[in-house]
Structures are given as structure tokens and as C-alpha cells.
Amino acid sequence: MTLVSKTFELYGKTYTFESGELAKQATGACLVKQGDTTMLDTVVVSKERKNYDFFPLTVDFNEKMYAAGRIPGGYLKREGRPSEKATLTARMIDRPIRPSFPDGFRNEVHIVATSLVADQVNPFDVINVMGASLAMTLGVVPFEGPLACVRIGRNVETGEFIVNPTYEERENSDLDLELGGSADFISMVEAGAEEISEDDMLAAMKFGQEALAAFCQAQDEFVAEWEQVNGPIVKKEYPLDQPVEEVQERIFAHYDEMAAALRDADKLSRIGKVEALKESIRAEFTEEEQAAWEREIPVALKKLEKKAMRTMVVETGERVDGRAADEIRPIMVKDNYLPLVHGSGLFQRGQTQVLSVLSLGMLNEGQRLDTIEPTEGKRYMHHYNFPPFCTGETGRMGSPKRREIGHGNLAERALLPVLPDENEFPYAIRVVSEVMESNGSSSMASTCGSTLALMDGGVPIKRPVSGIAMGLIQEEGKTVVLSDIQGLEDFLGDMDFKVTGTTEGITALQMDNKATGLTFDILARALQQAKEGRAFILQKMLDVIPEPRHTTRSTAPRIVSIQVPTDKIRDVIGSGGKVIRGIQDETGASVDIQEDGTVFVGGTGESVDQAVERIKLIIKVPEPGEEYTGRVVSIQPFGAFVNLLPGKDGLLHISRVAKGRVEKVEDVLNVGDEVKVVVIEVDDRGKISLDRLDKPEAPARAEGSSEGDGEHFQRRERPRRERSERSDRPRRPGDNGGRKPRRHHDAE
């Protein structure tokens, strides 16, 4: 195998594909670069087919901190549990690739994306789909390719779309749209947006489809060059689970029974009826037939259920729960659901129920991110939990799974555009959405529940956000767009298209599509139908809580911000943090200082006011004419130093400590005495001169002492040594007895 490398320019960016040098024992491997960002994508396919009734695909993103020149945090100092970004990247790679494999493929497939270089300029996530696509192509894996993924941004100043924007370009973009698919087919969409219109979103998707085609063509060119160097790629045959005609005929004879079993609005009741029917159908096969067709019978039963559900929708216009295509399930909304917490909301739509709970904290309680991205942290966090009881099942509880992380991220992106700026609302914000019941669209219920919790907690969001999940059925040449899909319609349908937004526009999108016949006209219809559904749901929410509460809960921390001159930051912090720790210990408030001098003070009760007052005193510069009651902290022969404010001392000169002449400051003042003073001068170096208010009379002096009345005071004569005594000591070189050397002048 000979190394092949090809570099090309697309949409103002440089890309490189390489293969033939690294990971040669994998089924396929490809190195892909954007700028200096370098990713290695590998694929391994098991030699034996597994006895599964599903496609066993696993995608891992191997985030290496050395790619960004960093050492991992933590005690072990090595990579461990995947970060949230790594999990989301793995999902991004998985979603466009999974539907590209043929039905019945049961060999295990493992795709691993490894970060080798993260140049902090070009994002590393979307290019992995191209790398995985090329690895599968070169490894002769059976899939519908080539595939690509692109990110589309939009410059807020010019309105121009940008393909795969840099981190800097993303900062100036009101759209973050990720599209995955082939040259003529979009299978995955993930987006966050600053309330943009449906028309603008559709235009961005069309532009992205053109970019997908360009990147797929670049892959074809690389493969052609590879074959010129290494010879033609020979197609491999993998066994597929194929339906047995006899099994299908016998099972599909029960079509009417399946259609009847599916007609039930209650999820658990419907599942019970369908499973009972499947068992009765399975019992019609002999033990020998069941053993021979162990894999074929479950597949055929699933196809029967799918066919009955889909045909019902396209032929009658009625869904399994009796709703019309654009009808939304009954909605129940409650705010202020839990006492004492900082905010809460309960949102129920049909048999999907989510309780969202708000927690507020200091900004330094936000999440710090230890990733290879330049992003250091985030202030708003949304966490989505999907316990087994929400579907009436048993199971293990533990760390969040990939699906929970993905759904939580979607609801997080949905609310980000409407959150207040941290200068307006200086809090770290966490919302946890607990799924109490689930029958589809739980992520959209989490979005609605998060809005309720934020408004209930007094977070001044710009506009409330609602969300809806749209579906698609394409059967027998007919197309039906479904609003507010439930679990069965998601599982057996062709599309899961989630849309969130406000009255002003879209804030987030997520789509997984299996229908090759999806057109932009259908997408436009789905977006418009989603807009109408979002408005209906939003009104139900506003009927309960029309606007955010004007104040936060009494149980929430109170946070205020003050501005400190940057040259005073060290005064507030103190040596080794001594001053700021003292403020926090003595007041009970939390203090967080930013590099620009913004200080956030948080706490409960009077602790915030006390801490703010302490900080103001530290940064205050005394002005001439201001009066203080200070404490004497030091006495010198020339005067006393009086502490006016924390870290601010002024000099009370000896001539100003009392009326009349004072020989020694200690005769009038002692360390620790309180004294009323007035500032008379602050020089250019910040030195403060004081005068004493209500000066006392200077103490009377003993007889013979000078009181400044003109009398001469007699010095006590000290015994004088004879010169001979002084001359006895040895003279040092250059010693002139303390006298300056006499200068000799030449006579003129």
C-alpha cells in the first residue's frame, strides 16, 4: 500500500486527504486536515456476522489533549471519560453514516476518530465524517457513499453564508448549522441560531447541500487518484439478513389485526396489544420453523407493524392515537411546582412529561471545559435525565448516556439566544430536566420546561422558547408531515425533525432523516407546520406564566456587580488572597473578580451589602476635606500614621497632634487610639496628609524644658575625652577623623 495525499481548496479553506501510511491493519483509514487541524478516522468491520436484530455500529471520538498542546487535568493526567464535546462529535459522525448502510447488515462496525492536531483556528468535528467516509470507501465497506458533513455560518454584518467557518468567524455568526449527507441527500441536521426566519434557515440548508456535493466530489477525486496508485478497489460481499418470502406472507396475513391493535391512544396499552398479537403470530410457527427462522420472524413482525402504522396515516389521514396529521396532543403546564428551589416548571404533552428545575449560582460556578477547543467554559448548563421508570422499564442508573447528552445539548442551544447578558444578570444558570414520562418529543418538552423554570425563577429571558418534533411518512407515493410525533411515529417513521424558537424565529434544529425522497419543498412545509405548532404550544405556556417574574426567589443567591479600577484589583485580592478571603470569611458572601475589574458579590441576607461596602472602602481614594475617625497604627518621631480605610493610612504630623508644641508623639497618642482627622492633602504619589480635629492641649512639660517661649534650655554637659585618648585608637586608611580633607588651592 502506497501513501496517497491530495490537497484541495474549497470555499476559501484548504483540505488534505491522506491514506496508506497510518493504521494499515484497520479495515480502512484516512487522515483528513482542515488547515493544520488533523484527524485520523479509522473503520474496522468484523469478519463474522453477529446474531443481532439491529445494525451494530459504534462510533467513538478519541479526544487527545496533546492535539492542542495541553496536559489533561485531574490526578491521573491522562485522557479518561469522554468530554461532552467528544460525545457530541461521536453522535455527529454516527447520525449521517448509520442510515447509509444496507438493511440486514449485521457485521459489527467500529469507527474511531482520533484528534492528532487541533490548531485552535479550524474546528475539528465536521471533517471527521469525510474521513470516516473515505476510510469506509477504501476499506470496501458496503454503504451509500461518499458522505460529508459541513458547518454553515452566516456573517451578521454581510449576511453571507460561510462554509466550515473558523472559530473566529463563528464568533461573528448568527447561525451554526451542521448538515450531514451525500451529494443529493441530507440525512442529518443540527443547528443553533439567533432567532432566524424559516426562509433564511431553508436558504442555509440549500447552500449547505451544494457544499456537501462539492466535498463528496473531492472524495471521488481522491479515490480515483488512490486507485491509480494502489490499483482498483475490489468490492466485497457481506451477507445480509434477507426476508424469507414464506415468512413474510404468513405474517402479513395478520395485517388487519395489527392495524386494529395499533389503534390505541394509550402507549402502554397499545404496546401490550401489539406484543400479544406478535406472540400469537409467532406461536403459529412450529418449533422447528421458529428455530430455522429465528432472525427472520422478528424482522418480519417489525415490518408488519411498520407497514400497518404508515399505511394507516397515508390512507386515512389518522394516526394511531386518533389525531390528525397537524394535531398536537393535550398540553398541561404548571409553574412554581417545587418549593424552595430557585425555579421550576412542569410541562406535559400527551404521555410525555418533564419537570425542569432551575439553580442559580455565582459566575465562577459555571462549567470549566477541559477540551481541545479554545472555549474555556460556559455559564448556562442544561442537563437532561431519562430514567428507566419514565418508560415503565427497569434498568441501571448512572452516568448520562450519549442520547441524554445529545438531548440536553439541543435544549441548551434552544435557550442560549434568549438568555440575558451576564452584565444584566450575573449568574451561572443550570436547568435540569427530569423526564417523568416519555412517549416521544421529550427533548422538546425539556425545552418548554426549561423556559417555564427560567421564567418562574425570575431570569429575564428576552422571549420565551417553545419546541415541537415533526415527523414524516412517505408511503405508496404519498407524503404526510406529522406534528408532535410520539415514540412509535419516531421509530417507524422516516424523519425526526425537532424545531425550537420564539415568536421572532428559530433558535435550534435537529433532524435525522431516513427518507431519500425528502425535498426542500417538504422541508419548507415541515418548517411552516412547526412554526404553527410552536405558536400553539407557546400560547399554552403564556396562559400560565405570561412573563418572567420580576425578582429571583428569596432562596436564590443575591448577586450584585461593582466595577473596580484595574490598578486596584490587587488591593482587593491582597497578598496571597488574604484580603478577599478575609472579606468572604467575615461577611459570608462570595466574591469573584474578573480581569477587567468587574467584581461579582453573591450571598444571602445582608452579607452582600457588607461585602460590597468593604470593597468600596478598599478602592476608595480619600479626598481633601473628608473627615474620618481612624485608628493609630504606627508612631514615628515625626508623627502618627492613622488608618482611614482598609489599606489606606495617612500621616498626622507631630505638629498637628495637639495645640502647642509636642516633643514626643507618644505624649499625646498611642497605637490603637481612635482619632478624628481631616484630609488636608493627597500628593501625586498618593501620600495622605492629615490634620487632627478637636486637638487637645499639648501636655505641660517639666521645669527646664523648652516650651517654645524663647527661653534657652541648657544642655547637659557630657564629659569630654582628652584628645590623647581619642588619638590612641588606630587610624584606618583614609581616616581623617571625621573631617573632610582640606582642599589645597594653588596661588593665583
Give residue spans per PLM region.
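Single-stranded RNA-binding regions, centering on S1/OB-family and related RNA-binding modules
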Residues: 557-559, 566-748
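Long, charged amphipathic helices and adjacent flexible linkers at domain junctions
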Residues: 233-242, 536-562, 608-629
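Extended amphipathic alpha-helical scaffolds
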Residues: 1-46, 51, 234-373, 557-571, ...
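Mobile "lid/hinge" segments at catalytic clefts and subdomain interfaces of large enzymes
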Residues: 140-264, 454-550
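Conserved phosphate/anionic-ligand binding catalytic regions in large, soluble enzymes, centered on
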Residues: 28-30, 122-140, 335-358, 439-459, ...
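Long, basic N-terminal domains or extensions that often function
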Residues: 1-235
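Glycine-rich, flexible beta-strand/loop modules in the N-terminal catalytic cores of phosphate-handling
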Residues: 26-110, 115, 119-122, 183, ...
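Flexible, glycine/charged-enriched surface loops at secondary-structure junctions
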Residues: 103-109, 144-146, 215-234, 289-297, ...
